[in-house]
Amino acid sequence: MKQHDHALVSGEFAKHWAREPWPPGSTLYAIAQHDVAWQGPDASVRWNEEAGRPYSFLDYPSEPKLAAYTAGLDLLETEDSYAACLCSMHYETLVHGSQGEAERRFGETEVSRQRRIKTVLSEEEIGSLDRNLRFLKLCDGLSLFVCLNEPGQKGYPPPYPEGFVLDGQEFEPIWEDDRTLRLDPDPFSGPFGISLPYQTIGRDGRPLGDGRIELRVT
C-alpha cells in the first residue's frame, strides 16, 4: 500500500467526523495530504534484503526518507501554510528524541519552519494547532489500523500502540464482519465507504498483482 493512499483514507475518517469542534478545511486538507511526501519514494520499491520484503515507513532508510519529508512539506507550504505547519509538527514528533544526526537536523529545521509559518497565522489558528495535531494523529492511526490489520484483528498500529484517544475520549475499533468496521463510541456523521488500493511486489521490485480493499465504516 502506498503511503499517500493511506493518508487519503485518513482524510475520509476526518471528513466524516461529527464531533465538535469541527475540523476546519485546512486541517482536513493536512490530514488527507500528510503523506504526500511519500509519493516519490513509493514510485519505486526499495527492497529490504534483511527482512525479505519492501521497506516500510517504519524501517525506510533515514536520509532519503527525511529528504522526501522536507520536499513534501515544502510543497504543502506553497499550497496551505496552516496545513504545512500541522504536517511539520506531525513529522517532527516522529523524530523527536532520536539520537540520529539526520533526524536531529530535520527536527531543528522543522521547528524553524513552524516558527516562520506561525508569523502569518492568526492567534486563533496558532491556538488550534495542538488539538488539530492530535486529531490528525487519531485519523492517521485509524487508517493505519485498516491498512495493517486483517479483518478481526485488534492490535493497535505503530506509532499508536496505546490506542486511539482524543480529548480524553477513547475510541475502540470493532470489526462487525470482514467488510464492516465501527468505532465505539460512534463519532461519525453517518456510514461511509473506504477504498484502498494495494500491490503485491516481487523481489525485483516489479508488481506481481494488485487489488483493492473495500470497507464500510458504520
Predicted regions and their residues:
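Non-catalytic terminal regions of proteins
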Residues: G107-T218
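Active-site nucleophile-adjacent alpha helix/oxyanion-hole segment immediately C-terminal to the catalytic cysteine
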Residues: W17
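Divalent metal-dependent catalytic cores for phosphoryl transfer on phosphate-bearing substrates
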Residues: M1, L8-E12, E20, P24-N149
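Short linear motifs at secondary-structure transitions and domain/linker junctions
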Residues: Q3-V9, Y156-P161
